[in-house]
């Protein structure tokens, strides 16, 4: 499966993302993020299920010690403001051409993958985007430090 994905990576058409950096098409990039997250959680010994079809608001269901969690996977991008190293991901979806927010009824967590680590954020802690910081130029009390959102820290796995 990964060999086929690697072939697609090399042949994938590029497009411009929101930050004007060249990337492959967003659908392929999203699928890669989903695979990275699934692989990470599975390697930790937990089950991951994928819903059939496109009607569900979540991408994966994780079975963490008998508790089923609805997970929406989002691709992160390097946050480009001059505020120290951070990643950002959108916490909205698109349905019928309209931007929609997620609620606790839709999902339990957002998950993203960055530099070998899965980060999870409870849906109730988000608005239209989430920024997780690795370093900052100022020490503001509202900074969301990435280390506090690792899957290990949040879910205790």
Spans of features found by a protein language model:
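Mixed-charge (Asp/Glu-Lys/Arg
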Residues: 1-56, 62-157
């Amino acid at each position: 499966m990964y060999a086929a994905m690697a072939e697609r990576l090399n042949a994938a058409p590029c497009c411009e993302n929101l930050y004007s950096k060249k990337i492959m098409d967003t659908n392929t990039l999203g699928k890669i993020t989903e695979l990275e997250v699934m692989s990470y959680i599975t390697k930790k010994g937990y089950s991951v299920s994928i819903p059939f079809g496109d009607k569900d608001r979540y991408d994966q269901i994780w079975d963490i010690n008998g508790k089923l969690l609805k997970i929406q996977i989002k691709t992160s991008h390097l946050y480009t403001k001059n505020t120290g190293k951070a990643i950002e991901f959108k916490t909205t979806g698109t349905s019928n051409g309209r931007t929609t927010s997620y609620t606790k009824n839709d999902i339990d967590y957002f998950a993203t993958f960055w530099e070998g680590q899965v980060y999870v954020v409870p849906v109730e802690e988000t608005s239209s985007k989430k920024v997780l910081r690795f370093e900052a130029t100022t020490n503001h009390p509202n900074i969301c430090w990435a280390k506090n959102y690792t899957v290990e820290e949040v879910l205790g796995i």
